[in-house]
């Protein structure tokens, strides 16, 4: 079923806007204090769209009513330490092109992917490290490297500060993992191997259980906080990346491989509600407007999927 109750609007990245901001000399990252980027000063008749480079995840900042887009940047073998964070207005216009990453002063952000906002912080996974930044200032506030991790993909942060993160891994099932990181920074492998199958998106359900979607199949897995498999549901398509769980238990799943979005209401089968969204990645839910906001990886764009009037 195509585009049920949805309208998709794509805001493409403008490469010229990104490239216009010069990089500081190598080795300058710790020489000066961190400085956040500032909002664009635009006239009423001017609107700027884009500014993304491999936008992998978006989180909704309800306090400022902005979308926080995490950009992985260039590949590490091309430009190391190139990740940055953009702020986007709900109409799709750019608020701050590079809020975190306008320069590299006091900043390490190599290749960030998944993100979450919790307890006044923006948390991101960055290869084998979880980093967090002050949501008011953008300033780096901490980092937890995890020994043995290879490349984290997504994360979710519980109210008590516990971090759950996925490692998608390789074709080796032993590399398919969900990690648990305590507020003290102690990391353990919570789940490993099947039924994980290239795990990607992760979220918490209303009961505090951990929900994970796989790239390798269409399974939607719910685990208890101690890692016990509770339920297995099926999305409409495999190749899944983005995951949103609403307070009523409804799940939305995006397929990065097939460009679709599915909805799974509690106790019901999955239904496709949108398609035609290339590389639909780690999305967020805008509770004010009842919409999904979906980054599109190397398409350097963000898609908005309207879910219709709230009931």
Model-flagged regions — what are they?
Residues 2-19:
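Gram-negative bacterial Sec-dependent N-terminal signal peptides
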Residues 24-43, 79, 83:
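Blade/loop signatures of beta-propeller domains
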Residues 42, 129-160:
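Asp-box/WD-like beta-propeller blade repeats and closely related beta-sheet repeat scaffolds
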Residues 43-49, 94-106, 139-145, 186-193, ...:
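A short beta-strand motif characteristic of beta-propeller blades
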Residues 52-64, 75, 103-122, 147-175, ...:
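Beta-rich, blade/repeat-based domains predominating
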Residues 70-96:
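Beta-propeller domains
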Residues 83-86, 129-131, 176-179, 219-221, ...:
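A short loop-to-beta-strand structural motif that recurs across blades of beta-propeller domains
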Residues 88-93, 134-139, 181-186, 223-228, ...:
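Short loop/turn segments that connect beta-strands within beta-propeller blades
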């Amino acid at each position: 079923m195509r585009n049920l109750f949805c309208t998709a609007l794509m805001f493409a990245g403008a490469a010229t806007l990104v490239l216009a901001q010069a990089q500081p000399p190598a080795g300058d990252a710790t020489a000066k204090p961190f400085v956040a980027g500032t909002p664009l000063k635009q006239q009423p008749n001017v609107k700027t769209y884009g500014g993304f480079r491999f936008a992998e995840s978006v989180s909704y900042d309800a306090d400022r009513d902005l979308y926080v887009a995490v950009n992985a940047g260039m590949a590490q073998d091309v430009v190391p330490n190139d990740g940055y964070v953009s702020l986007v207005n709900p109409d799709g216009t750019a608020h701050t092109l590079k809020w975190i990453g306008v320069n590299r002063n006091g900043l390490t952000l190599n290749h960030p992917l998944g993100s979450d906002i919790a307890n006044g912080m923006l948390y991101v996974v960055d290869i084998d490290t979880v980093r967090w930044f002050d949501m008011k200032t953008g300033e780096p506030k901490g980092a937890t490297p995890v020994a043995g991790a290879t490349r984290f993909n997504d994360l979710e942060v519980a109210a008590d500060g516990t971090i759950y993160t996925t490692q998608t891994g390789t074709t080796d099932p032993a590399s398919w993992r969900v990690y648990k990181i305590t507020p003290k920074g102690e990391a353990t492998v919570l789940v490993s191997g099947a039924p994980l199958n290239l795990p990607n998106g992760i979220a918490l359900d209303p009961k505090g259980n951990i929900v994970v979607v796989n790239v390798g199949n269409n399974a939607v897995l719910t685990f208890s906080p101690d890692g016990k498999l509770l339920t297995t549901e099926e999305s409409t398509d495999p190749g899944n990346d983005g995951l949103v769980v609403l307070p009523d238990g409804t799940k939305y799943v995006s397929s990065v491989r097939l460009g679709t979005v599915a909805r799974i209401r509690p106790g019901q089968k999955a239904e496709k509600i949108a398609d035609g969204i290339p590389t639909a990645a780690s999305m967020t839910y805008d509770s004010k407007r009842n919409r999904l906001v979906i980054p599109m990886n190397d398409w350097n764009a963000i898609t908005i999927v309207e879910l219709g009037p709230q009931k």
